[in-house]
Amino acid sequence: MKLIDAGYGNRVSADRIVAVIGADSAPAKRLIAAAKEKFTAIDATCGKKTKTVIVMDSGHIVMSAKEPESIAAAENK
């Protein structure tokens, strides 16, 4: 099982990632709001600005302060 660094010592399983998207778009913000309502949002930002939303196959979303490009590059290694 390969783990991807989500920032600040947090890791997510690369096998379970469905999508890595930027957090600035309106659809991403709606996705975050819906996940918070359903209690499926995981905040891995440690209080920093959310830059990336990682969608997992379980329906959870992980919010990260790392850039989407760096997470996608780590996933492709």
Where would I find each of the regions flagged by the language model?
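Amphipathic, hydrophobic secondary-structure cores in small proteins
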Residues: 38-39, 44-49
